[in-house]
Amino acid sequence: MEVIINENERSWVIDLISKTNFILSSNDLIIKKAGGESTVSTQSTGRKKNMFPDLILYGNEEKSVILQGWEIKMPDTPIEDEEFIKDAQRKAVALNLNSCIIWNFTYAVLYIRNENDEFSILKQWNTTSYIQSRADVKIYQSDWEQLLEEIIIELNSYFISGQLHNAVIGNVIAENIITTLIKRNKDVISEYLKNSAFCNNVLSAYIDNWWIHLKNEYEHDESDKYKAYAKSIVLSWANRITFAHIIKNRQNGALLINEFNYDTTPREANEIFSRITAKCDFYNIFSSMNYDEIIPVVSWYDFIEYSNFLKNNGIDHLNQEALQNILEGSIAVGKREINGQYATPPELAKILVRLSVQDWRDTILDCCCGTGTIPREAILIKKNQLSAKEAVESVWACDKYKYPLQIANISMIESDTIRIANRIFQHHALSLSVGDDIIIVDPETGEKL
């Protein structure tokens, strides 16, 4: 089955979304909004299946509560097409939803998922079974629009009954999407890196050296250096995109993330993140990895689609608790995927911090911070007695390696401290000396402190 739809088919998807919104505006339903057009691409790149549904129903105007995803095809794709069905169900699972709809203008089918992740048909609509071709879609437009309204009204009843469940965008990001990005792209990027290294001895030597120092971190997870590095690339891009969208409502410099589109290259994306860093710092989160631009187009479009999804799905309107869930979810995925075997458990970190610190007014340094569990706990403990600003500014952290610092920096941030500069930097602990100059940038002004 062709994955990237043509312009004609895309226009019908957009029409379907527009008509759905018209129906919703004329009724008072649990379903409040329809969207999804921003993640539909017409690029012909041999791309994998899209990550997100063609049409998404939302439970609020801000589009932060997701109700259901629809997959849309034209009548020349049979409603019983297995790939069509599986694609819709896969996306429902990725969005943590228990239902999905497939629609080909001839038929519409509602699937429901049970606790064992098994889907079954809950309802099928056959009213427009006489629509058999793309030409018929235009001829009988008023007919399928009438059916669409009937479906929306029926779906409202299913949601009222509790039979169909929703998902909150914050939980979806924290629990599902980043893991999905890794599963979809790790092997593809790994193979691309391997082929590129065959023609580039500098790249080959760099990954060899990187693997020598970090192999032990992956020994229970990855035995292939290219797959390990590919996983780091996926997490790095995902974390940068996620964090930029999280802070853009508080940091105007991060609004540059909205410039991402299907014409943006990885190199141009890195330039955008450099501009964001210049305006609001968070260098350890937004800085690029070496060779992270060596990524196939089919994988790169996943990151663009993810950014578009965040751009248009209510992340600006999440409350502090939801934003904190996203931050903590990103941390958990990063630790689990990269060095979960060696991450300090939070309870142990609390004990170590309390055993090590005599006066909580003192400045604290963790010079081998890894993914930041210990400095995070130090900040949380300090905040019980000190202001958030005093707590953050008196806890320092560094590590020899770059990627853990991205996770550590996210780990040390809470929704109430986004405007405060973390004292975190890359440095080898054994060469760290009193008097070394460390540059910290104010995230509000972009000026050096």
Residue ranges and their predicted role:
Residues 25-48, 346, 368, 422-429:
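Long, charged, glycine-rich C-terminal linkers/tails
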Residues 250, 280-355:
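Class I S-adenosyl-L-methionine
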Residues 10, 14, 243, 320, ...:
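Membrane-embedded glycan transfer/ligation machinery
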Residues 1-44, 352:
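Acidic-basic catalytic patches of nuclease active cores, encompassing PD-(D/E)XK
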Residues 53, 58-60, 64-72, 77-89, ...:
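Charged, often flexible domain-edge or linker segments that flank or initiate folded functional domains
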